[in-house]
Amino acid sequence: AAVTCIFMTLFGLSLGFALLKVQGE
């Protein structure tokens, strides 16, 4: 459960950062 939570958090941050980078350009 803990590993899944961490994985989901990292995935969410990566996705959010990617979206911000795309909108920034």
Curated annotation (Swiss-Prot):
Tagged with keyword Membrane: yes
Family annotation (InterPro entries): PetM_cyt_b6/f_cplx_su7 (IPR012595)
Membrane spanning stretches: 2-22
Keyword Transport found: yes
Assembly and interaction partners: The 4 large subunits of the cytochrome b6-f complex are cytochrome b6, subunit IV (17 kDa polypeptide, PetD), cytochrome f and the Rieske protein, while the 4 small subunits are PetG, PetL, PetM and PetN. The complex functions as a dimer.
Function description: Component of the cytochrome b6-f complex, which mediates electron transfer between photosystem II (PSII) and photosystem I (PSI), cyclic electron flow around PSI, and state transitions.
Protein name according to UniProt: Cytochrome b6-f complex subunit 7
